[in-house]
Regions:
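A short pre-motif secondary-structure segment
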Residues: 116-117
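Internal acidic/polar
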Residues: 72-95, 99, 125-126
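Short, Lys/Arg-enriched C-terminal cap helix and immediately downstream tail that follows
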Residues: 20, 148-167
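Helix-turn-helix DNA-binding module
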Residues: 107, 111-112, 122-139, 153
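Structural recognition of an alpha-helix C-terminal capping motif at a helix-to-coil junction
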Residues: 32-39, 48-59
Length: 167
């Protein structure tokens, strides 16, 4: 690996965990996936470690989501809704509500728009985003602009109780 792994870890780990959290919606699982991606980087010694880590981590999260979907189809016990826990503070409820609206708004985006937005939010450059998504570098700015606009529209619609079409 051309760059020092400790330095890459120091500068990339938190962004990678945030990126993964927005894919798996579980903080502990996001950290586990980030650590696994770094472990794989030690073995593979990629030329561009930062971009490689995000690509590998995204693939691991995608594989895990597919595996989980298969398990849910086969295990009827998982169809039960988990019970909500009561929170004592109105601020905590508001924050949770905002997180749920952001998550719902993200899910209304097309997979491509969501991926580009999350990669950008994680700190990847336009070149790194283009390499991972297969989009032309020049299309990244347009895609980001559209994704941001649609995210805001979906978030605001969620706040007012409206429905926004997916994609």
């Amino acid at each position: 690996m051309p760059q020092d792994l400790a330095e890459i870890y120091r500068t990339t780990y938190r962004a990678l965990v945030r990126f993964l959290y927005r894919k798996v919606w579980d903080a502990e699982r996001a950290e586990d996936l980030a650590q696994e991606a770094f472990a794989r980087a030690v073995v593979h010694k990629p030329e561009n470690p930062r971009g490689w880590l995000f690509i590998v981590a995204a693939n691991m999260a995608r594989d895990e989501a597919r595996r989980a979907a298969r398990e849910r189809r086969h295990l009827s016990l998982l169809t039960a809704e988990p019970q909500e826990t009561a929170r004592g503070h109105e601020e905590a409820l508001d924050a949770e509500s905002d997180r749920a609206r952001v998550r719902a708004a993200l899910e209304t985006l097309s997979p491509r728009d969501r991926e580009v937005l999350l990669l950008w939010d994680a700190g990847l450059s336009y070149e790194e985003i283009a390499a991972q998504t297969g989009l032309a570098r020049g299309a990244i700015g347009t895609t980001l602009s559209r994704a941001r606009r649609r995210l805001v529209e979906a978030f605001e619609a969620g706040r007012s109780g409206e429905h926004v079409a997916r994609g």
